[in-house]
Structure formats: structure tokens, C-alpha cells
Amino acid sequence: MNRTNKLILGAVVLGSTLLAGCSSNAKIDQLSSDVQTLSAKVDQLSNDVNAMRSDVQAAKDDAARANQRLDNKVFRICK
């Protein structure tokens, strides 16, 4: 190979390497963005679960009070 062909081949190899590096950086940036998005979704789901816990506890308390009222009525009827 003459000198010109070697320079062209070297430039092509260097260019390909640089493009591959840019592609990897773009993929890393995309993955980083995806991780941030997923982290935000996990935080939102965690907040939703915590909000539901208080709702579930309130429902349990209401059910317990209703059961107690029913038990009291049954006890009075059976007397």
C-alpha cells in the first residue's frame, strides 16, 4: 500500500473508532436517562403505596367499628 492509501485507511479506522465512541456515549446517556425515569416512577409508586396504607388502615378501623356495632346489636337481641 502506498502512503496515501495508508493515510486514508488510518483516517477511516480513526473515524470509525470515534463514531463508535460517540455511539457508546449516546447509549450511556440514554441508559442514564432511563434509570432516572425509572427512579422517579419508583418514588411515585412508593408514595402511592404509603398513601394507600393509611387508606387501608382507615378501612380496617371502620370495619372493626361496624363489626363491634353488629356484635352489640346481636348481644342486645339475644338478652
From Swiss-Prot:
Coiled-coil ranges per UniProt: 28-69
Lipidation (S-diacylglycerol cysteine): C22
Keyword Cytoplasm attributed: no
Keywords carried by this UniProt record: Cell outer membrane, Cell wall, Coiled coil, Lipoprotein, Membrane, Palmitate, Peptidoglycan-anchor, Repeat, Secreted, Signal
Induction details: This gene is probably poorly expressed.
N-palmitoyl cysteine lipid sites: C22
InterPro entries listed in its UniProt record: Lipoprotein_leucine-zipper_dom (IPR006817), MOM_Lpp (IPR016367)
Record PROSITE patterns: PROKAR_LIPOPROTEIN
Compartment(s) of residence: Cell outer membrane; Secreted, Cell wall
Membrane topology: Lipid-anchor; Peptidoglycan-anchor
Signal peptide: 1-21
Molecular function terms from GO: lipid binding; peptidoglycan binding
Start and stop residues of the Sequence repeats: 25-35, 39-49
N6-murein peptidoglycan lysine: residues carrying this PTM: K79
Pfam family, one: LPP
One GO BP annotation of this record: lipid modification
Annotated Gene Ontology cellular component terms: cell outer membrane; extracellular region
Quaternary structure note: Homotrimer.
Family per similarity comment: Belongs to the Lpp family.
Reported function: A highly abundant outer membrane lipoprotein that controls the distance between the inner and outer membranes. The only protein known to be covalently linked to the peptidoglycan network (PGN). Also non-covalently binds the PGN. The link between the cell outer membrane and PGN contributes to maintenance of the structural and functional integrity of the cell envelope, and maintains the correct distance between the PGN and the outer membrane.
PANTHER family, alphabetized: MAJOR OUTER MEMBRANE LIPOPROTEIN LPP (PTHR38763:SF1), MAJOR OUTER MEMBRANE PROLIPOPROTEIN LPP (PTHR38763)
Protein name, entry field: Major outer membrane lipoprotein Lpp 2
Originating organism: Salmonella typhi
